[in-house]
Every structure is written in C-alpha cells, then in structure tokens.
Amino acid sequence: LRMSRGLGDVYKRQGSDNEYLPHNYDKNCVVYTGTHDNDTTVGFLQNMPEKDKKFAKKYLGHKNDKKLCFEIIRAALSSCADTAIIPMQDYLELDSSARINTPSTLGCNWKWRMDKNALDPKLAKKIYKMAKLYARV
C-alpha cells in the first residue's frame, strides 16, 4: 500500500539495529531523529545503555558525547532518505525536559515551547549549512 501510494518507509534514528542505520535506508523513505512521542536525542543518549552508546560513537566516528547529538542529525541529513525531519529540540541539543509527550501519561505533556531567543544566528547558520551541504534546502 505504501509503495502504491508513493509513500516510503519511515526510519527513526534512535536505536542500533542494522536495518535502521543510514547506510541501509531506501531513497523512498523518511528519516527523523524524533517525534512528539519519544525523548529528545540528547535525552535518549543520556538514557542509552553504554554498549549501544559505544556502538553509536564508533559508527558515527566520534568519542565525544557532546558532539553525538549533532552527528546523529548529520547522519539523518546525509542519508539517501528523500525526507529528513529534525525536531528543534534536537538542533537545540535539549535533554528530556524538552520532551513534548510521554504516551499514556497525564501531567506535563504538550507543555514545551521553544524560547523565542533559542535560535541564535550562529545556530541558524549551522543548521542552514548542514541542510545546504546535504541538499535539504
């Protein structure tokens, strides 16, 4: 049905199963680092089992935890996927406190708002350069 309607697969960049690694994506797919229903990438990394984090660092070629979030973004943008979606919380490198929704829970869901000053010119330029480099603009 997806293919008959011209819709591709959807891949989430959280996890280390081989099927979900960027080098295995089909062109006709959507890759994203997160949605409203899962943790931010930084929050995900903070809670990731050490062996999975070690694999992610090796796969992405970085040993520094601080750079890992942006390397995951880079992997998504540089993939062959037709569409890449990166939540602002990931560009801003925010932790779990910026999560939008935790399914099946009551309370603080849907409360996060981006501060109007959060996207400074330096970050905007970094986002634009990566998007341009990987032909996403």
What do these predicted ranges mean?
Residues L1-Y11:
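Single conserved hydrophobic/aromatic residue that forms the stacking wall/gate
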Residues D9, V31-Y32, A84-I86:
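Hydrophobic faces of well-ordered beta-strands that scaffold small-molecule active sites
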Residues K12-Q14, D37-D39, D82, D90-E93, ...:
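Short, solvent-exposed loop/turn segments at secondary-structure junctions
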Residues R13-P22, D26, V42:
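Mg2+-dependent phosphoryl-transfer active-site scaffold
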Residues H36, W110:
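Conserved, mostly hydrophobic/aromatic
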Residues V42, N47-Y59:
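Polar, glycine-rich mid-to-C-terminal structural blocks
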Residues K57-I86, L92:
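A glycine-rich beta-turn/hairpin centered on an aromatic-Pro dipeptide
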Residues D95-N109:
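C-terminal/domain-terminus segments
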